[in-house]
Curated annotation (Swiss-Prot):
The gene is eno. It is an enzyme of class 4 (lyase). This is Enolase. It comes from the Bacteria. It catalyses: (2R)-2-phosphoglycerate = phosphoenolpyruvate + H2O.
Length: 475
């Protein structure tokens, strides 16, 4: 990479060394870690996450194949950093984030980053960013906002968390086909209060599951993974847990779903098959199979019964017409999030905007592979009056970069797992630290985060059984 005029031997932001190694994610599989050191000694360490249910259009995560680690090793990606990327960015000003990212994209030369690996490129992108922030003595979120994304304004919006309390689909070995059942503390006024509410509902749910003789095993993202008969049963249990914790459904705590419908879409049948429920004998194959229209109607019915404010990947990632229909039908009151459809790709997100396919985009750094392209996607969504939800992956690490990213871009929402497993809690603890640091400059919007919906978080028509002692909305 060509050096710029701003770079000299005396420039404290000059990249001095780049070193990558193989670390482990929360599932015990290898992942890429990278350390970038600047001339002044400032260090930036990054660790890349990995998904279980992945979109067809994601940038390529380079794995070794073979027998070691069941083919999941990442020594190829590590070597690409140490031998191909690192040597070419030595001496470059670390604040040139966009130029460094664009150089790595050009060096790779493929549309999906298949040559060097998106996991290799992202590890360097994140580590460079963190090293520069440390050198300038700026919190990471502030550095990203002011120096990388060029965000204007003094206030930062803290994200409303989507907490995955019941896991299914590819994230759990149980009978539920929908992948994530989440709670959102929309009635809170601060991040601290939001996480208090989330913790209390989470533990109330655990007590409820035990009382009803369900197992309380955990899925990949820290939520419970009981064998349930339907999405309704999961939502009923969540509703009861909210009431047991002393909160009001819809007003204090709303629900969000990640259907991950591509995982149970049958190309052969051109239909959606709840295969886990069918395999368990809960549903016959006939009753467990739905057309696009039937699945849309089913999702609409769920939003009428429960305080669901967000549905992610309600249909197959390539079912553009179906997504348009879903958004047209319930998109005024429910956030319709595209994950696998867009894969944090600016071009695909622009296509979705032009079609009004959804009204929100999920943001996953490793789907696209650079911080620069991630910011581009968020900006495309915001310009279209869409929301953007910053997200973790099921194979996570203790790296809390996404917490800073959500605050830096004021996305207003973050999806980063349940109230268990330290790789998930690391993000929440980071958000608490940011809130304390910002003081009165920190804004938590609650239900107002759904700025493009007309009537979010409506009170559900279906109410759970009352708590033994009358539940009151906690203030």
């Amino acid at each position: 990479m060509a050096k710029t005029n701003s770079t000299s031997k005396n420039n404290k932001l000059e990249i001095k060394s780049v070193f990558a190694y193989q670390a482990f994610d929360s599932r015990g599989f290898p992942t890429v870690a990278c350390e970038v050191v600047l001339n002044d000694g400032s260090k930036g360490l990054s660790m890349v996450s990995s998904g279980a249910s992945t979109g067809e259009k994601e940038a390529l995560e380079l794995r070794d194949g073979g027998t070691k680690y069941h083919g999941k090793g990442v020594t190829k990606a590590v070597n690409n950093i140490n031998k191909k990327i690192g040597p070419k960015i030595l001496g470059v000003d670390a604040t040139l984030q966009t130029q460094i990212d664009e150089f790595m994209i050009e060096l790779d030369g493929t549309k999906t980053k298949a040559k060097l690996g998106a996991n290799a490129i992202l590890a360097v992108s994140m580590a460079v960013c963190r090293a520069a922030a440390k050198s300038l003595n700026l919190p990471l979120y502030q550095y990203i906002a002011k120096k990388v994304a060029k965000v204007k304004g003094a206030d930062f919006i803290l994200p409303v968390p989507m907490l995955n309390v019941i896991n299914g689909g590819a994230h759990a070995d149980n009978t539920i086909d929908f992948q994530e059942f989440m709670i959102m503390p929309v009635g809170a006024k601060t991040m601290a209060k939001a996480l208090q509410m989330a913790s209390e509902v989470f533990h109330s749910l655990q007590k409820l599951l035990k009382a009803k003789k369900f197992n309380t095993n955990k899925g990949d993202e820290g939520g419970f993974a009981p064998n349930l008969k339907s999405a309704e049963e999961a939502l009923d249990l969540m509703s009861q847990a909210v009431v047991d914790a002393g909160y009001a459904l819809g007003k204090d705590v709303a629900f969000a779903l990640d259907c991950a419908a591509s995982e149970f879409y049958s190309k052969e049948k051109q239909a959606y098959v709840f295969k886990k429920a069918v395999k368990a004998g809960i549903l016959s194959e006939e009753k467990g199979t739905k057309t696009t229209e039937q699945l849309i109607s089913y999702l609409e019915d769920l939003t009428k019964k429960y305080p669901i404010v967000s549905i992610e990947d309600g249909l197959d990632e390539n079912d553009w017409k179906g997504m348009e229909s879903l958004t047209k039908k319930i998109g005024k009151k429910v956030q319709i999030v595209g994950d696998d459809t867009y894969c944090t790709n600016p071009e695909l997100t622009s296509k979705g905007v032009s079609l009004s396919a959804t009204n929100s985009v999920l943001i996953k750094l490793n789907q696209i592979g650079t911080l620069t392209e991630t910011i581009q996607t968020i900006n495309i969504a915001k310009k279209a009056n869409w929301t953007a939800v910053v997200s973790h992956r099921s194979g996570e690490t203790e790296d809390a970069f996404i917490a800073d990213l959500a605050v830096a871009l004021s996305t207003g929402q973050i999806k980063t797992g349940s109230m268990s497993r330290s790789e998930r809690i690391a993000k929440y603890n980071r958000l608490l630290a940011i809130e304390m640091q910002l003081g009165n400059k920190a804004k938590y919007l609650g239900s107002k985060t759904f700025y493009n919906l007309s009537t979010p978080a409506a009170t559900p028509k279906k109410s759970p059984a009352k708590k033994t002692t009358k539940a009151k909305s906690k203030k």
